[in-house]
């Protein structure tokens, strides 16, 4: 089965479609209502509280809908409307809210993964001509689709093919490195995927937002694409393995971010490195206490085969760093320790405490606050670095101590990043355990809006207001 990245945006109405109005208020009633309509809303118990939705009658059907926002000023205030309103085409009337963020909340909430079964009902459609909102919704849907795809549909070959398809869509050059070339150039990554009948590969995408490339800043994105993680010989228990199709969530996030950058034609040079592998058990699989060579020339001892994501990323970071990018970002569903510390909604952000690292971290955190897409910075605490020591290799893949797992994983990756480079590492969950307004259960592109907005700020791109992501919080 093929996994195509081509899709429409759920909840988006065709341009020029006839529509019904939606009036959103924070308290009381909309001023324009007739006396009869106002009496109907009062009788319905409408007060403007968050989550209230009432259809306003008209002699020939429905005049529109009135929605309560209460004090919620996030985009999630509008996140449930695509499924709270009847099927049809609607428009948001101006009110005390950010129109772009309201539209984005609507479209994000309209998303459903329906590759194998039809949706129970179509979402209510929204009219909007905000190109950035539509692009964010499309990029988010791309990432969600990739994470939601079952592992028998999305393996290493299909994830690499999705990268090629994305490149072709935006006029980028892209290639896939596999076989002997992958084993030679990305030996640690290759060792992770060697146990699967579906071989490992690296997909690389190059794109320039300016005609000749020129002196445009180089942004490099690296994504962990473990399409299924059994844990290897350190086998996961059944409950922990259940959702491991989502272990390529970092790659999905980076592809969604790349799609948004290219769609908005940011004046940057972009490189994307996707490590597409499957961590399985076989006679060819890596074993505990194996010693592996990395692209950087350093050797690592495999302390646990279920700590495979850092082996994928270390070779990708080395390759990306060779081009000396102005910004180097990686994303991965890397550690359970990050989830213990921060839960499912807050990706952990790591960056070196250097001028370049602090600048990146500060920009990402600020962007997360303004886009309602938060991350939380954890330290790359140098005092824990000795915990990676081993007598048989340059260092181990895992800590010798049963604590600070997310930090030690970040310290491992930092060894493969050139000193002084602007680098940030995102340890994400990539999943919504339960549905909420704007955030359906399943795959999620946590951090996408924050990272995009931070790239705009960090590269000093002078964009019109509509090309910047913002929400009042």
Predicted features along the sequence, with ranges:
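Short amphipathic alpha-helical segment within the helicase RecA-like ATPase core
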Residues: 1-225, 466-473
